[in-house]
Regions:
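Structural signal for the C-terminal ends of transmembrane alpha-helices
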Residues: 56-63, 115-120, 169-177, 196
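Membrane-interfacial entry segments at the cytosolic side of transmembrane helices
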Residues: 174-187
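Aromatic-anchored segments of alpha-helical transmembrane domains
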Residues: 22-29, 74-84, 133-144, 188-198
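Membrane-proximal helix-loop-helix units in multi-pass membrane proteins
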Residues: 79-151
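N-terminal topogenic module of multi-pass integral membrane proteins
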Residues: 1-74, 78
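Structural signature of hydrophobic alpha-helical transmembrane segments
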Residues: 37-48, 97-104, 154-160
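Extracytoplasmic soluble-region selector
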Residues: 137, 190-272
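Hydrophobic cores of alpha-helical transmembrane segments in multi-pass inner/ER membrane proteins
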Residues: 49-57, 104-117, 161-169
Length: 272
C-alpha cells in the first residue's frame, strides 16, 4: 500500500495514464455484451476516476502541481473517451452531449485537488478531507447493492470495488489507528444511511375506475402485474427493462403505461 504514495508523478506518466484510461473506458463502452454490467460503470459513474485522481495528487510534491496535473489528466481522458467512440456510434459527435457533466467535473478538479491534497498532512484535517470521498464511495456501494439485488450478478464487481477502494484509501492514506477507526466509521454510516435513502420502490399501484379490467403486458419478464379487487393494479419489479402495459375496461376504456424497472425500482409513465 505504501507504494501507492511513493510514485514519481511525471507529466509523461500523467498523459500516458489519461490515454490508457480513456482507451480502456471507450472499448468497454463499445462492447454490447458489457451493457448494464460493472465493466461499463467506469464510463458512467465517478468511483474509478476518484482512484485515478487520488493516485495522481498524492504523488505530487506541491498543491499547485496536484491541481494542474489532475486537471490535465481529466482534460485529456474524458473527451478522448467520446472521441474514440464517435466512428462506431450512430450518434457520431452527438455523443459529446454527455460530456457536459465531465467537463464540469474537470473544471472542479482544480479546486478539488487543492483540497484533496491536504490528505497528505496525516492529521485530522486529512481524515475530514478523505471522509468526503469515503462517504461518496459508501453511497455508491449502497446504490450498487440495490442494483445487484434487482439484477444479480450485474454490478456486483462495482459494489465490491467501492467497498474495497474505500478501505484501501483508509489504510494507504491514513497512519494513526484513531484516524482509521473514524474513517471506517464514516464508511459504515454512509452505507447504512444510503441503503435507507436509496431503498428502491419495488412495487407501484395504478388506480383505475370501477368495473372489470383486463390487461396485456408487452414483456412480462420486466414486471409482474396483479389486478386487485379494489379496482387497482399492482406493478412489481422483476428485472431491469422497459415494457408497455395496456389496460382495457369492460366498457372499452383503454389506458396505456410505460413500465420501467431500473435499480430495482418501478417507474410508471402514462401514455396520453
Amino acid at each position: 500500500m505504501k507504494e501507492f504514495t511513493k510514485q514519481k508523478m511525471s507529466w509523461k506518466k500523467v498523459i500516458l495514464l489519461a490515454a490508457a484510461a480513456a482507451v480502456l473506458t471507450a472499448v468497454l463502452k463499445l462492447l454490447p455484451f458489457f451493457n448494464n454490467t460493472s465493466f461499463q460503470d467506469i464510463a458512467i459513474n465517478p468511483e474509478c476516476w476518484i482512484l485515478f485522481a487520488v493516485f495522481i495528487l498524492v504523488n505530487c510534491t506541491r498543491w499547485q502541481e496536484a491541481a494542474i496535473k489532475t486537471f490535465v489528466f481529466f482534460l485529456i481522458s474524458q473527451p478522448l473517451i467520446y472521441l474514440i467512440q464517435v466512428p462506431f456510434s450512430k450518434m457520431g459527435f452527438g455523443l459529446f452531449q454527455y460530456y457536459k457533466f465531465w467537463f464540469a467535473a474537470t473544471v472542479l478538479t482544480l479546486p478539488g485537488a487543492v483540497i484533496a491534497y491536504q490528505v497528505k498532512r496525516k492529521d485530522w484535517l486529512s481524515v475530514a478531507v478523505l471522509s468526503v470521498a469515503l462517504a461518496f464511495l459508501g453511497y455508491m456501494a449502497a446504490s450498487y447493492f440495490w442494483s445487484v439485488r434487482a439484477s444479480f450478478p450485474n454490478h456486483l464487481l462495482s459494489l465490491c470495488f467501492c467497498i474495497l477502494l474505500a478501505l484501501f484509501f483508509v489504510f494507504a492514506l491514513l497512519e494513526h489507528k484513531s484516524h482509521r477507526a473514524v474513517a471506517i466509521g464514516v464508511i459504515l454510516i454512509s452505507i447504512a444511511v444510503s441503503l435507507i435513502l436509496l431503498k428502491p420502490t419495488f412495487s407501484q399501484t395504478i388506480h383505475l375506475g370501477e368495473g372489470n379490467w383486463t390487461y396485456t403486458v408487452e414483456d412480462p419478464s420486466v414486471a409482474g402485474i396483479v389486478l386487485n379487487q379494489d379496482h387497482s393494479v399492482s406493478v412489481t419489479a422483476n428485472q431491469k427493462g422497459t415494457t408497455l402495459l395496456t389496460l382495457v375496461s369492460e366498457s372499452g376504456e383503454k389506458k396505456e403505461f410505460y413500465i420501467t424497472v431500473s435499480g430495482g425500482s418501478v417507474y410508471i409513465s402514462t401514455i396520453d
